[in-house]
Amino acid sequence: MVRYSLDPENPTKSCKSRGSNLRVHFKNTRETAQAIKGMHIRKATKYLKDVTLKKQCVPFRRYNGGVGRCAQAKQWGWTQGRWPKKSAEFLLHMLKNAESNAELKGLDVDSLVIEHIQVNKAPKMRRRTYRAHGRINPYMSSPCHIEMILTEKEQIVPKPEEEVAQKKKISQKKLKKQKLMARE
């Protein structure tokens, strides 16, 4: 059994999914994961499908050097964004895996929320490229590990209103003013 970096608050109402050494760019996947964090599973699935179709963008907040601006990033309150298709597809597969794990556990799939999602760097894979004058440069790939925990969102029940309204405390100054007004 692999250790997750976070234990769910209520393990009976949670499901997990993880992938190791995935051949997808770490930086793009990290930005995509941050975008879907806290979303409902249906909303996240629709969003990731829209990213692959370039209908919605992923805001690039940390790894944004040289990332161009796009109008779709405005809805996130940001200027820079991209459409990392491969990262979105990998995260879609992981959401599908988590959904099937939830069904196996007997959880309500429609009320699942992405409580925790984390992308870590995996060991780099090394290749080489040949340059002018007989030199050789590295040609590395940056794979990643992804883990996510989905939790059933509990229905928030409002507190019942108290039948007896508590008396408001009135300062001495206001009391004197009220008595003065009553005399007149």
From Swiss-Prot:
It holds the Pfam family Ribosomal_L22. One of its GO terms (cellular component) is synapse. This is Large ribosomal subunit protein uL22. GO terms for biological process: cellular response to amino acid starvation; cytoplasmic translation; positive regulation of G1/S transition of mitotic cell cycle; translation at postsynapse; translation at presynapse. Component of the large ribosomal subunit. The ribosome is a large ribonucleoprotein complex responsible for the synthesis of proteins in the cell. Residues 160-184 are annotated as: Disordered. The keyword Chaperone does not apply. One of its GO terms (molecular function) is structural constituent of ribosome. The keyword S-adenosyl-L-methionine does not apply. PANTHER family: 60S RIBOSOMAL PROTEIN L17. Keywords: Cytoplasm, Ribonucleoprotein, Ribosomal protein. Its main location: cytoplasm. Component of the large ribosomal subunit. HAMAP family: Ribosomal_uL22_A. It is found in: Cytoplasm. Residues 167-184 have a biased composition (Basic residues). Gene3D superfamilies: Ribosomal protein L22/L17. Belongs to the universal ribosomal protein uL22 family.
